[in-house]
């Protein structure tokens, strides 16, 4: 019986062997998480499996707290672990020290972490987005020199807005050197003074597009002073460069559409503006024509003497009153002189009287001169007004060979108001003429 081992003794021996084997102290394992559970203590319990085998595993709280992602069922992971035996159950398991997502999963994890960081810094804020110029003179295109992307962009811009100059900047969009080349070409394009920059490439896997998720590339796009359109991949592909750009296009073709106006739509707009302006001018001219017709029918223009008859009467009245005032003043002075002659010796006052006469004569001359100046000013002003009114008078117009055409007491101003056999009355400078319309010819005929 002493040759038999107990279960616990065998288990301890096997555990001892595992713990002493240096090859089992730090093992790198690749697999899929299953039966994942997080204990209230903070420890993690799970299985790691592939298509053929399953290993029990656990991760202590201290190591789990250092993870930069939240493990979940189905994650493909890379593990660094120690292999040992769980004595109570007698099965071996691994104790995980480090864990990271495998392949694409790890890339997505890095992508989300960088996206969160740049979002918190404001690199994706809409407030920082620049508007795309509507009528670009120069467009820089950063993409591979060959491939569908450059062909689509080039042909679309040429068909929509051929006035825009395209500056093609050959750029590496995939591979180890692509990141630095993309940054260099963005900075170069920004220095050219172009209106818009298109950064694009065709579709691909997340690994193919990863250069456009690099932090340095995203920051180069964010810091660019020239508006940037990002057209990386297909419609379902998204990169951090899309979020940093001023606008994201689903495809390179759509980027060219966003960057340019449609020349045919512009032509339609110009034609519409031309039609609207022509209609406005015609309407304004018609309004002015009617206004002139209304003024020409005003009775004062038909009888211009009505405008200055009252002014002539007023001038004559003022002239008469002024002369009467001068005469009355003269009579008063003469009567005063006579009284003085009766009261004083005429010989003694002769010198004084002569001086008074000279003063009166001087005042009279000044008054007459002032009167004549005023009368002349009134005459000249009246003459100018009469000449201006005569120039506007229909009578003077008729002296130049024109006539006023009336049909049934209505003034005719257009051939459109006449038909054949209409009876007309022509008012000329020296009389009236009855006429009959035999034919109507318009200027457009």
UniProtKB/Swiss-Prot annotation:
Give the reactions, separated by semicolons, that this protein catalyses: Exonucleolytic cleavage in either 5'- to 3'- or 3'- to 5'-direction to yield nucleoside 5'-phosphates
Q: Which UniProt keywords apply?
A: Cytoplasm, Exonuclease, Hydrolase, Nuclease
Q: Which GO terms describe its cellular component?
A: cytoplasm; exodeoxyribonuclease VII complex
Molecular function (Gene Ontology), one example: exodeoxyribonuclease VII activity
Where are the membrane-spanning stretches? none
| Nuclease in keyword set | yes
Q: Which GO terms describe its biological process?
A: DNA catabolic process
Q: Which domain of life is it from?
A: Bacteria
Tell me where it resides: Cytoplasm
- Main location (coarse class): cytoplasm
**What EC number(s) does the entry state?**
3.1.11.6
Q: Which residues form a coiled coil?
A: none
Question: What does the UniProt function comment say about this protein?
Answer: Bidirectionally degrades single-stranded DNA into large acid-insoluble oligonucleotides, which are then degraded further into small acid-soluble oligonucleotides.
- Assembly and oligomerization: Heterooligomer composed of large and small subunits.
Family membership, please give it: Belongs to the XseA family.
NCBIfam families tied to this protein = xseA
Please identify the protein, giving its name as recorded.
Exodeoxyribonuclease 7 large subunit
Source species: Staphylococcus aureus (strain NCTC 8325 / PS 47)
Q: Which gene encodes it?
A: xseA
